[in-house]
């Protein structure tokens, strides 16, 4: 008998859970969070359990596992995860843990296998998770059907792979249907990752997202990014000028001609998709504003499509141009440590050194990511001070941050089993 299965150690985080709910219910929604949300390891553990283990996350792109047996791995808190392409082309996700004695099955970030074989004692699994071989000494009453890999919820749409560690994750199909439609012109099954980077930021994951959700800091911090990016979120942005609105109107005619979706679509505060122009005379997020890849994505014929921006909370933002896409994902490590992964995707037939130069492709966002890292880290250092107290957000410039923290508060209270106040979306988002 497994005595640990009946042994209850209690929940050492229970006092912190109650404190978390109390602080969220009483917080001023126009101010930053109380200090423990950014600094305390106990609240970080609650973030992982109630947000990252219960919400939908972007694990990767379907083009990263194009054929049977292709896999990718990732780490979500203490949980190693495996995503693999099955025999019939399906995408499967499993806990990357052998059912024998718990060793990780796949140790590399990406690869290709015929079967999943544990490196410890060679227990062998089919690509759909079924146990095929467990040696010959497990006893007559051993039933291999009871020891398949533990599955993880997985959905795909528009070339993205979404996973959730929860048994009953929140509904997401309405967003995925829209994402599939908006991504159709890019034909993501015929894309590839040209280059990928991961940087470590000495800051809480929420500070990383907060920094992304506003461009209040852009003029003073991001000269490379502002060579092409128009900082307004869309035409409802309270900062948007009439000239910007006129530019959007002119661009929509061209997008209609190309049958390119562009209308703002939001799904609560968690998801939004919108296509916005880049700076007039530029077509891609490069230092000179020219194409980063000569070969355009999918069925796209005109490189001047602006940038389609995709938000997926809690951890991803994306820019989709005519010639390449950039996918960002945020992975919490500890209360004050976060990984930020950036992937640049191009057409699968684009040839490095001929159609695109990797250094040029990544130049703008390498600089921007490093600038954002420094901003988040300095933000964290200040918040650690005894002098910190929550400060006010600008509803004109920081509405995206307000919306993120409202989403976070609502989901945290919901997942803790607590009631939350009605969350109002701030205009411009």
Swiss-Prot record:
Subunit record text: The system is composed of an oxygenase subunit (GbcA) and a reductase subunit (GbcB).
Residue pairs linked by disulfide bridges in the UniProt entry: none
SUPFAM superfamilies per the UniProt record, alphabetical: Bet v1-like (SSF55961), ISP domain (SSF50022)
Disruption phenotype: Deletion of gbcA and gbcB abrogates the ability to grow on glycine betaine as a sole carbon source.
Listed GO MF terms: 2 iron, 2 sulfur cluster binding; iron ion binding; monooxygenase activity
Binding positions (Fe cation): 217, 222
Domain Rieske stretches: 56-163
Binding site for [2Fe-2S] cluster: 98, 100, 118, 121
Catalytic activity: glycine betaine + NADH + O2 + H(+) = N,N-dimethylglycine + formaldehyde + NAD(+) + H2O
Details of cofactor binding: Binds 1 [2Fe-2S] cluster per subunit. Binds 1 Fe cation per subunit.
Biological source species: Pseudomonas aeruginosa (strain ATCC 15692 / DSM 22644 / CIP 104116 / JCM 14847 / LMG 12228 / 1C / PRS 101 / PAO1)
Physiological role: Involved in degradation of glycine betaine. Part of a Rieske-type oxygenase system that catalyzes the conversion of glycine betaine (GB) to dimethylglycine (DMG). This subunit is the terminal oxygenase component of the system. Required for growth on choline and GB, but not for growth on DMG.
Family: Belongs to the bacterial ring-hydroxylating dioxygenase alpha subunit family.
Biological processes annotated in GO: glycine betaine catabolic process
Protein's UniProt name: Glycine betaine monooxygenase oxygenase subunit
Cofactor: [2Fe-2S] cluster; Fe cation
Enzyme Commission numbers on file: 1.14.13.251
Induction section of the entry: Transcriptionally regulated by GbdR.
Keywords linked to the UniProt accession: 2Fe-2S, Iron, Iron-sulfur, Metal-binding, Monooxygenase, NAD, Oxidoreductase
Entries under CDD domains matching the protein: RHO_alpha_C_GbcA-like (cd08884), Rieske_RO_Alpha_N (cd03469)
């Amino acid at each position: 008998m497994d005595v640990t299965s009946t042994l209850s150690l209690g929940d050492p985080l229970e006092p912190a859970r109650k404190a978390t709910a109390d602080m969220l219910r009483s917080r001023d929604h126009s101010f930053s969070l109380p200090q423990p949300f950014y600094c305390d390891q106990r609240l970080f553990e609650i973030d992982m359990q109630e947000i990252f283990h219960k919400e939908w996350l972007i694990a990767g792109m379907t083009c990263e596992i194009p054929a049977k047996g292709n896999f990718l791995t990732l780490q979500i808190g203490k949980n190693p995860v495996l995503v693999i392409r099955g025999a019939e082309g399906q995408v499967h996700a499993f806990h990357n843990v052998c059912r024998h004695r718990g060793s990780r099955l796949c140790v590399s970030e990406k690869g290709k296998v015929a079967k999943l074989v544990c490196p410890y004692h060679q227990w062998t699994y089919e690509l759909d998770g079924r146990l095929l071989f467990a040696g010959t000494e497990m006893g007559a009453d051993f039933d291999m059907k009871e020891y398949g890999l533990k599955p993880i919820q997985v959905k795909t749409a528009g070339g993205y792979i979404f996973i959730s560690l929860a048994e009953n994750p929140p509904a997401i199909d309405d967003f995925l249907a829209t994402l599939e439609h908006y991504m159709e012109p890019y034909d993501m099954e015929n894309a590839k990752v040209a280059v990928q980077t991961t940087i470590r930021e000495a800051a809480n994951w929420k500070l990383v997202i907060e920094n992304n959700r506003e461009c209040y800091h852009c003029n003073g911090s991001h000269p490379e990014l502002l060579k092409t990016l128009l900082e307004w979120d869309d035409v409802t942005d309270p900062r948007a000028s009439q000239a910007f609105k006129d530019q959007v109107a002119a661009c929509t005619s061209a997008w209609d001609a190309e049958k390119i979706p562009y209308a703002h679509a939001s799904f609560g505060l968690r998801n939004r998709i919108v296509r916005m122009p880049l700076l007039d005379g530029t077509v891609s997020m490069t230092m000179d504003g020219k194409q980063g890849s000569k070969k355009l994505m999918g069925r796209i014929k005109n490189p001047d499509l602006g940038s389609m921006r995709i938000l997926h909370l809690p951890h991803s933002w994306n820019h989709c141009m005519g010639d390449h896409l950039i996918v960002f994902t945020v992975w919490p490590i500890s209360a004050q440590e976060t990984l930020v992964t950036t992937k640049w995707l191009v057409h699968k037939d684009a040839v490095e050194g001929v159609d695109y130069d990797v250094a040029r492709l990544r130049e703008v966002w390498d600089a921007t990511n490093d600038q954002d890292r420094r901003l988040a880290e300095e933000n964290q250092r200040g918040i650690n001070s005894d002098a910190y107290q929550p400060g006010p957000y600008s509803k004109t410039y920081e509405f995206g941050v307000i919306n993120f923290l409202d989403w976070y508060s609502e989901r945290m209270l919901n997942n803790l089993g607590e009631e939350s106040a009605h969350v109002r979306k701030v205009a411009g988002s």
